[in-house]
């Protein structure tokens, strides 16, 4: 959380390399109460670790290797984390839920979904090269994840805290190539279709 950098600015000697990972727990205690702090901090730390692999804007179907199973592994990491974040969200007192959605649940869900989308695109292209019909199923998964991305952003903008953060999640991030890209909307990556007459 940004409070780490504020604390570092206030007292640089108070924050060492060893303190960085534990800094999230007091922050989460302040946001979600004593009972939920440790688990929220664990999820937040993992979210930051996974997000450090690559930014959402720079990710594409070639970011990880599909043939070696690397894509599946990193996508599964996020799926597990999303399940854990959702499980905790459902146990929170109602007064903590908006903050949890903003700070933890949305970032985890959005990145998990993006990983699922690009994994599906990678699998689609990999299987299409072999003229395998499963390529078409993976194309559909990619389309569904692309749609879910927009629904997650709409929910963030309009549902959290009654729409308090409206407009925060409107930046385009799928199809981004450079900081000054000017495109009107997120773009679904190109998908391949294996025609029925080519199916082996």
Language-model segments: which ranges?
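Substrate-binding groove of N-acetylhexosamine-processing glycoside hydrolases
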Residues: 1-200
């Amino acid at each position: 959380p940004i409070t780490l950098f504020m604390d570092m600015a206030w007292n640089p000697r108070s924050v060492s390399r060893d303190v960085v990972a534990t800094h999230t727990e007091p922050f989460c205690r302040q946001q979600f109460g004593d009972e939920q702090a440790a688990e929220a901090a664990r999820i937040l730390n993992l979210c930051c670790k996974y997000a450090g692999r690559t930014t959402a804007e720079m990710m594409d179907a070639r970011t990880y290797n599909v043939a070696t199973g690397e894509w599946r592994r990193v996508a599964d990491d996020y799926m597990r984390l999303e399940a854990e974040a959702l499980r905790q969200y459902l146990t929170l007192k109602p007064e903590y839920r908006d903050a949890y959605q903003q700070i933890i649940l949305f970032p985890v869900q959005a990145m998990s979904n993006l990983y699922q989308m690009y994994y599906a695109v990678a699998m689609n292209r990999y299987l299409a090269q072999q003229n395998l019909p499963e390529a078409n199923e993976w194309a559909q998964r990619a389309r569904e994840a692309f749609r879910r991305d927009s629904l997650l952003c709409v929910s963030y903008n309009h549902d959290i805290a009654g729409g308090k953060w409206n407009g925060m999640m409107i930046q385009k991030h799928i199809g981004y190539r450079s900081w000054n890209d000017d495109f009107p909307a997120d773009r679904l990556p190109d998908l391949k279709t294996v025609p029925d007459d080519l199916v082996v």
